[in-house]
């Protein structure tokens, strides 16, 4: 996976994601206007589905073997615990960055997840803590970080974090996603597995 190719892929990825999201939103709006009840959770699944679809197409076109090039190796209990501790320690920093950024931007994530909180707990976990990490870590720490890593660890962590932040398309989420992306990159590097950032 060459750096220049993955740079170009990010542009295609964002354009494709926005374009397909608009198409899906239009279809959902048409269905609702036609009297068809469309659950709100559908849009969350569609959003992650679009990301996964683009990632799969890219891997097929570039002939990327996910088993060989995406580090999904098993991690030990110590790495699991350390990953959970690292994630927990990130919470204060994320909250601080989010609150500071809200002085000049809007927290769209908080507004968008309000409806999800009305769903059963199991569904909340699946929609917020299972599907997004699995899909987004594949593309950002798997494809992007994996590509940039060949040019050096520091640059790879910064670039994967930057792209992770930019992908969220709003200042509030972009700022703390940038920090999260960098930390997750180092976690993957330390454990040699994408599972450390997923959990």
Indicate residue ranges for each PLM-predicted region.
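N-terminal, membrane-interfacial amphipathic/helix-forming hydrophobic leader that caps
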Residues: 1-68
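Functionally important transmembrane alpha-helices
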Residues: 22-26, 173-199
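Alpha-helical transmembrane segments of multipass membrane proteins
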Residues: 26, 56, 161-166, 182-186
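Juxtamembrane helix-loop-helix connectors linking adjacent transmembrane helices
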Residues: 32, 38-39, 67-138, 146
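Membrane-interface starts of transmembrane alpha-helices
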Residues: 34-50, 123-124, 152-156, 160, ...
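Residue-level signature of the transmembrane alpha-helical core
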Residues: 45, 49, 80, 84, ...
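Membrane-interface helix/loop boundary segments of multi-pass membrane proteins
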Residues: 135-159, 186-193
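Membrane-interface helix caps and helix-loop-helix hairpins in membrane proteins
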Residues: 166-172
